[in-house]
Amino acid sequence: MIFVPLLVLGGAELGLRLAGYGYDTGFFRRIRVQGQDFYVPNEKFSYRFFPPAIARTTTPFRFAAKKATNSYRIFLLGESAAMGDSEPSYGVGRYLQVLLRERYPGTHFEVICVAVTAIDSNVILPIARDCARHQGDLWLIYMGNNEMVGPFGAETSYGLHAPGLAEIRTLLAIKQTRTGQLLDALIRRLRSGSSTPKTWGGMGMFMHGRIGYDDPARLRAYANFRGNLDDILRTAQRACVPVVLSTVAVNLKDCAPFASIHTPGLSTNQLSAWNEIFEEGITNETAGSYRDALALYRKAAEIDAQFAELQFRLGDCDLALTNFVQALRDFELARDDDALDFRVDTRINSIIREAASRHARQSVYLVDAARVLAQNSPEGIPGLNFFYEHVHLNFVGNYLLALDFAEKIKGLLPNSITGRDQGNWASEELCGRRLAVTVWDQQRVWQPIFARVTSPPFTGQFNHAAHLKLCEAKLNEAKAQMDTQTPEQARQMYEQALALAPDDYFLHAHFERFLEAGGHSAQAIAEAKRCCELVPQLPGGYYYAGTLLVREGKIAEAADYFSRAIAIRSDYAEAEDAMGEILSNQQKTAEAIHWFKRAIRANPNYVEPYLNLGFLQQSRGEVDAAMASYQKAASLEPEGPADYFNRANMAAALYRWDEVIACLRAVVKAKPEFWQARYQLGIQLAANEKTEEAQTQFSETIRYRPDFIPAHLNLGTALATQGKPDQALAEFRTVLQLDPANSSARQQIETIETTLHHNP
């Protein structure tokens, strides 16, 4: 009888595969580029571990299916810290690649980063199994930060909370089948109204997942990590690949706990006494009486020592009193007791060290990054000297970690490579030149970091204000450095780096952004197209190329690039919205609305399609619908540009014109590319007879959207009013190129030409 259900399941599986249903679960997929086969990331790999709406992907890469004879291939496994968040192009793998290439010329070192944001060891194990098939010479493993918050973690905001490994692997095996994927999709649909995230919300998604030091789910997560790590190392052993396994360093000194909870079972009297002592300690610490504060905190610890904030405050006091060894221990305990566990703790690093020891005879080599970064830190306690925030390394930190890896790798390289040893490792400064770390890039990297630390869970840290000041100082320091390098010097750095690495996608991508920021549109487009050639599987490359083409007025070509992005990723909201904008400006209303609504379905929290839909509705006189769209956008961006744009339109409905202008000025200051706001501001300024200012806003609107006909019409009118007929004619003729049937433009041209004829 068992054969009947097996036959049914087998038939269903075959039918689904023949119908093309489901997705490939492998980490890599094969593509062909100019007659050569390459492997690139499979964008749907993480669907087994995340709801598709919040699935994570790795950084762009491609490597030859047939490894060249002079190549040394390294796979770097881990999470966002290994990847190099917030800017992977300056991650540890990139620095390592430069170090090896500079010291051992003639060898093509491939450091392939297969690290992915927000994953954990449950995801890294199948990645490792796929890497085992692709001729790796060495694996680097730098993982552990997400064991509590990643898929199947103890604090995850989606899925099961730290089930056993057998259950996890059974579920993942089921999802490898198309039948399992169908069942998973049906279950998600039935739970569509549940608390499962619809879009990725970063670290703030895990705010409600607090667990204690000895919580059973936490202990299961540790056991799972140990089992997964052992299996990863055994996978490498079977593939005959040596492994450099590293402990993980974290910010101890400048990152307070994200959440603190008391030891379960304390009585009301104990909690009351603890709070009284703790608050008195804070009063003394704030006043600079660190010895008195320290004594009070230690007294509180006699009642409950597991409150993470208490341990961190002990660390601050010991640090102030130069008790550096004890301060380090205090900060480590604060990290270990953190109830929102985004950092590798003592137990995770102990598991890593123990695994390296157990597998030492199977070519597993330990790098103790946690100790190395501590030893190179002031007072022996790592902080913002090496980190952007809690775990992500800055330029200096990534270089130091890469140098530590390189030293270990040096002893593992074959004689065919070490025979060309140049004798020294490249300096951080030289690595920076090879990676084109311009002052413009340094400032650019700090901006998303600063935005991150102004959001949950960082806002929940008790010392958030002080931490924010430190980060703000770092950002200002980066901005101040902008004066130390001219744009031409930065450009030369890019060009020199590209001359040595002409196929480096990251260099081309950053050079593209740099050229765009400098107003070199044609060259920026060339770089964007080169990026598409290097990583043809990446939809973002086509999208960015399309946005540049729009600004150059090459609308048909831009639409083609947006279409190619959508062909790769059917739910690419940004590209769908961009298609809607093009069609809207071509007055293809129904098609434009279709694309805007499709973008909203793909990402309900994406502001732009609501604004663009509202602007289209407003132009059609559908005021109520437009206001509803603007209000939705405003709700997604409170106190942001969308909010002020909504306020401007609400004020316009009440004829409060000064308020309209003030709000629109605020919008364009905060978001210069918000072309609809610029256009509306131009209209208001023209109505107030501020013609020159209006002309500026219409010109800026056209710079961002050269296909927006009303801006050309209004700019032409403003120019004609100022007695500039030739320039006005140029704008009206542009309108006719965009819309040959435009009667307003024809009438304006006739009027100006008649005037010029009578008044030559």
Where are these regions (language model features)?
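Serine-dependent acyl-ester chemistry module
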Residues: 144-354, 372-384, 407, 411-495, ...
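Helix-start (N-cap) detector for alpha-helical repeat units in TPR-like alpha-solenoids
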Residues: 274, 308-309, 505-506, 539-540, ...
